Each structure stands twice: as structure tokens, then as C-alpha cells.
Amino acid sequence: MAALTCITCRVAFRDAELQRAHYKTDWHRYNLRRKVAAMAPVTAEGFQERVRAQRAVAEAAEASKGAATYCTACGKKFATFNAYENHLGSRRHAELERKAVRAASRRVELLNAKNLEKGLGADGVDKDAVNAAIQQAIKAQPSTSPKKAPFVPTDECGRAAAGARGVPERDPTEKPPRLQWFEQQAKKLAKQQWEDGEEEGEEEEEDDEDEDWEDIDSDDGLECEDPGVEDQDAEDAAAEESPPLGAIPITDCLFCSHHSSSLVKNVAHMTKVHSFFIPDIEYLSDLKGLIKYLGEKVGVGKICLWCNEKGKSFYSTEAVQAHMNDKSHCKLFTDGDAALEFADFYDFRSSYPDYKEGQDPAELEALSTDKILECDDETMELILPSGARVGHRSLMRYYKQRFGLPRAVTVARNQKAVGRVLQQYRALGWMGSTGAALMRERDMQYVQRMKSKWMLKIGMKNNATKQMHFRAQVRF
């Protein structure tokens, strides 16, 4: 019987060197742990099998770290599959997945509504196919944040991913859509002014010059006409009638992908869902033209309705719509000279004191230019064309001549669409800019003035008492 043994591992050795080397091995340490746990020792072959199995598990974990898992619904990247499984069971992922399903369902319903308008019924549609389409739309939905997007190492993969998301490639040297749209509007305005100037010049020439007209044959007249000019005019007219590429139709929402069956329903949707309102709607004369212009501004120019040229540039309609929804910019900017942008769609003649209902605008302009100022000899007051009264300075020593501005504001006859929208605004509690709103504004101005005076008074009073570190610069 050998004298050198290991009781823990139940093995014998020929010499002391092998015994000391055995005590330093992992096999002996493993059996020591098993002995402490009151478990039987394992043989050398069994220990090697367990080591190989543990190495396989470690290699699989390393491989899973290299192949990261990505959640499309949440836009998150996970290093291990276990973390990905834990994320799938979280409440946050379930909420985002439900939102994605609802968004995809709304998109499918919108497409179905458009198909119904085109005459394509939904009969015979397979429900399984619809569900598969919804799941495919969820998987194809892009990430909401560029920081959460999966990493793409090569340019080819980047171009493929951009094409899959539907984002067109953009040339860095290309001008932003906003700048291009502003240039187009400037060209249209210059062209319109030039045409108006030509028409005025032709009218003046016809009035000043008396030319002798000669009778010519019909064949000669046809020979003088240039067919190329007529073709060019027809092309220009067709270009003006057709909407620009990318413009939002008047039946689609300016701030989301909602589609309505009519213009009035579209405006009602934008009012209720996005709190969009049209300023001075009682004087609006062309609702369709205004919504069409705003659709071109958002769809073609990619411009925020509130930021205008001051905000950052956008390169897609979805981006500018998301910006307006996130920043609560679903409103028109009409402060100062910005209101002149929408002047063509309004008619404020009904607010003029000398306006008569049913009067021709041309006659009104002629009367306004030839109008004579009225003067009252008894009160020595001068009545201006705007209705304002001006007193004489010789009477200033007796009393202060302060005349109000009487304005009889009447609501002009407008289109049926504008009337319906106005009724919707009033049903939502809109009161306009008169009455209690003006009184409240004046009260707030008075409160602000009193607060400013009080703050100035307190500041002046504490200016002399709160100088804790003041030191006189005389008599050192």
C-alpha cells in the first residue's frame, strides 16, 4: 500500500513531488469545495469534462456579445441575449410595442380609407394578411432617435439602410428645401409684379396713343401668330394649376398623416387634435387657398409654420411635422410684417368705417383716392377718410380734444366653408379679440405697470440700506 495519498481526491502517489504538485491543481481545489459541501469527490476524467463544458458556455457567451441584439420597437441595442429577453418582458417594451401596433393599424386604416374613396372595397381581405402587413410595418418602422439606431460599419450597408427607411440620399452641396422654396416664391412675386407693370403700361399706351387700324385677311393674321408662344402659355398655365411635387393636399392634415373627406373636416381635425386656429377668421375670404398655400409651405418647403426662416432646416415632411408637434408650433406666425404673407387670403374691407355692403372694390379704391376731407365749422373738427377726428389747436387752451374712433365692424359675407369653421371655433369657446378679452388684456397691463412701479420703489429704498460692503473713499 502506498504511503503517499490524497484523502480528498482518493488517489495515491509514488513520490512526494507528485503529491505536492497535486495539491496545487484545480482538480484538488474543486474536490476540497465539494468536501466542504459534504459531496463526493469527482475523478480526473469527470473534472476535465466539466471544464470543457464550462469553456463551451463561456465561448457561447462571448459569441453572443459579438452579435448584438436590436429591438426595433424601442430602438435599443443589447449586448447579450439574456438582456434582450429581459427587455422583451419589461412593461416599457410592451407599451411601446402596443403604440407601434396602433400606429401601424392607423396607417393601414388610412390606406383602406383611401382605397374606399378610389372605389376599391375591403371585401374579401384576408385578416391574416392584414395582421402580417401590420407586423411587417412595425418591423420596417424606423427608430425615433438617430442615437438609438443600430451601428452600420460600411457605406454600402448605410445606403441600404437609408433606402429601407425611405430616406432619400441628399447631396451636401444641395440647398435646403426651405431656401429653394423661398427662391421660388420670390421668383413668382417678381413675375407677378412684372406682369402687372406690363398691363399698366399697355393700358397707358392705349389711352394716350390713337393708332390707325388696318383691315387684314384672316390668313395673314394666322401667319403672324407664333404657335410657340401659345404652347408656352399653355404650359405655364398647366404648371400653375398642378400642385408642386410633395405638396400636402387640402384634405390631408398639415401636422400628421390623417386624411379627411373634405376641407372643412380637415380643418376641424386640425383644430381639435392639434389646437390649430386661423387668426381673424371672420375676415378670411379664401380658406381653400390658405390651406393649399400652407400645404405647399410644409410639404415642399419643409418649413415650420411658427419658426418660418428663423428655425433650423428640415429635409423631410415627417421631420417638420414631428418638430411642430413636439414644440407645439401648430399655429401661424402673424406678428408684425409676417402677417403680410397671408394678406392675399383675407378681406378686411368690412372693418372700414366707410365700407358699404355690396360695393365694388374698384369703386371703393376710386372713392378713397378722390375723397374730400370734411370739416365742421362749428366744432372746428376735421374728419379724415379713416373716420378719425382731428381738433384745432386754438381750442386746446379751453379743453383737451380727445376723440374716440367709432368703428362699426360688421362680419362680411364669406364662403360656406369659412362660416362652418367659424361656428366650430365658437363652439370650442372662441370669443375673438373683443369684449372680455380686451378688458382682461388691459387689466393685465395695468397690473404689470403697478408691479414695475412697486419693484422700482422697493429697489430704490433698499439701495441705501443693503450696501453691506460699502466703504467711504474719503478720510482714510
Swiss-Prot record:
Entry GO terms, CC: cytosol; Golgi apparatus; nucleolus; nucleoplasm
PANTHER family: CYTOPLASMIC 60S SUBUNIT BIOGENESIS FACTOR ZNF622, ZINC FINGER PROTEIN 622
Region (Disordered): 137-243
Residue spans, zinc finger U1-type: 4-28, 69-93
The protein's name in its UniProt record: Cytoplasmic 60S subunit biogenesis factor ZNF622
A molecular-function term among this protein's GO annotations: nucleic acid binding
Modification Phosphoserine, positions: 275
Domain of life of the organism encoding this protein: Eukaryota
Protein species of origin: Mus musculus (Mouse)
A GO biological-process term: ribosomal large subunit biogenesis
Family: Belongs to the REI1 family.
Extent of Basic and acidic residues compositional bias: 167-177
Modified residues (N-acetylalanine): 2
Protein keywords: Acetylation, Cytoplasm, Metal-binding, Nucleus, Phosphoprotein, Repeat, Ribosome biogenesis, Ubl conjugation, Zinc, Zinc-finger
